[in-house]
């Protein structure tokens, strides 16, 4: 299966009538492997900050997490594995695998739990595949 198929079929899938606003699979260096049409472009320093938070959980909490200049308040996650952010009525979930970052961005009416489920399910699958 291509990386684009993972995005199209597993991240942008319908969940209780709703979809993520955008999604992508990136390398740890920020290189886009596949993305949805409306996925924002990360700046290199944003990827650096995200990767540092995976290595040093809590690094982003004081400043927030920036994605294409949009600021997300960092909320509960799983240290070293998942970063979650909230911005207004939407948010973001980032799951780190051995080689990739699986990213989902949502807006209402999709819930944070639905976004977490979609992103983390694919991320867990990729981890089991050694990716």
UniProtKB/Swiss-Prot annotation:
Keywords: Actin-binding, Allergen, Cytoplasm, Cytoskeleton, Disulfide bond, Phosphoprotein. Gene3D superfamilies: Dynein light chain 2a, cytoplasmic. Disulfide bonds join 13-115. GO terms for cellular component: cell cortex; cytoskeleton. Its main location: cytoplasm. The modification Phosphothreonine is found at residue 111. Occurs in many kinds of cells as a complex with monomeric actin in a 1:1 ratio. This is Profilin-8.
């Amino acid at each position: 299966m291509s990386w684009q198929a993972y995005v199209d079929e597993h991240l942008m899938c319908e969940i209780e009538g709703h979809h993520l606003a955008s999604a992508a699979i990136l390398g740890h260096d920020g290189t886009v492997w596949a993305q949805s049409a409306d996925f924002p472009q990360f700046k290199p320093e944003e990827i650096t900050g995200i990767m540092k938070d995976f290595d040093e959980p809590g690094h982003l909490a004081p400043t927030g997490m920036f994605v294409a200049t949009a600021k997300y308040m960092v909320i509960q996650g799983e240290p070293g594995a998942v970063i979650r952010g909230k911005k207004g009525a939407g948010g973001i979930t980032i799951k780190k695998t051995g080689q990739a970052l699986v990213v989902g961005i949502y807006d209402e009416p999709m819930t944070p739990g639905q976004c977490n489920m979609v992103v983390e399910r694919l991320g867990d699958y990729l981890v089991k595949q050694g990716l």
